[in-house]
């Protein structure tokens, strides 16, 4: 039962149109990307920087360095595949979540709310990561390029096809699936748990502001918990590229990752660069991920509200 502060379309028992959810998810993806594109570039540059290199030090300094060496537009490198990825990812994530949520509620009516949210969120994350992965990899490759020459999406695709084949578009997908599955499950679980707690204490003075911040809280928790795996994913996405000389002064670092398992790569990073390497870029990651998650969830819910209002208006005499 949803007695809360506002309708929650992600709640167990809520019957949501899969079609409407896909549209709302696409819209949320566009808004989320528009707000955070430059931060994404800075975050990924941090994650890809080996410990031997000390080029990018602080957020402001990194932005100045990128603009000085590559121009202002460099902060939007990879924006075309990234925007497409956010649209596809948002559509599949929320669409599959609604579908799994409806099916799970019908098949397992006694399943707990939090248990269902965690399970359905994981399934939605796994599905969306597989569908959108080639776009995610393209985004990382384009952002990693430090030269002033702007590689086009078509050129990058052609180089990947010639040098790596079809498999090149899915390099590191198992790690990505782990990252996104965990992140999505934690995000939806945190979001729903915060809203449930607020509904159970709706008369308390803090319930409304905390409920309004549920998307921010969900983004913070999910990103912090999976960031080390996300760093591993980024490094694996560029390790087979023939352009690694354009990504760092120490391309041999990435070459050493080739033909190794994700476990072996993490061990190598820990041994050569320390634990801090897995968290490099976390501050910018939170600056980007927290508003991204909050905007995505907010826009999705408000778009679904518009669909609800439209249906009620259509039924009115």
Swiss-Prot record:
Keyword Thylakoid among UniProt keywords: no
InterPro entries assigned: Mit_carrier, Mitochondrial_sb/sol_carrier, Mt_carrier_dom_sf
Principal location class: mitochondrion
Localisation per UniProt entry: Mitochondrion inner membrane
Gene Ontology CC: one annotated term: mitochondrial inner membrane
UniProt membrane topology term: Multi-pass membrane protein
PROSITE patterns recorded: SOLCAR (PS50920)
Membrane-spanning segments: 15-37, 80-100, 118-138, 168-190, 205-227, 281-300
Solcar repeats: 16-103, 112-197, 206-306
Keywords carried by this UniProt record: Membrane, Mitochondrion, Mitochondrion inner membrane, Repeat, Transmembrane, Transmembrane helix, Transport
Entry annotated with the keyword Protease: no
GO biological process, any: transmembrane transport
Signal peptide: none
Family under the similarity heading: Belongs to the mitochondrial carrier (TC 2.A.29) family.
Alphabetized PANTHER family for the sequence: SOLUTE CARRIER FAMILY 25
Function: Mitochondrial transporter that mediates uptake of thiamine pyrophosphate (ThPP) into mitochondria.
Protein's recorded name: Mitochondrial thiamine pyrophosphate carrier 1
Annotated source species: Kluyveromyces lactis (strain ATCC 8585 / CBS 2359 / DSM 70799 / NBRC 1267 / NRRL Y-1140 / WM37) (Yeast)
Taxonomic classification: Eukaryota, Fungi, Dikarya, Ascomycota, Saccharomycotina
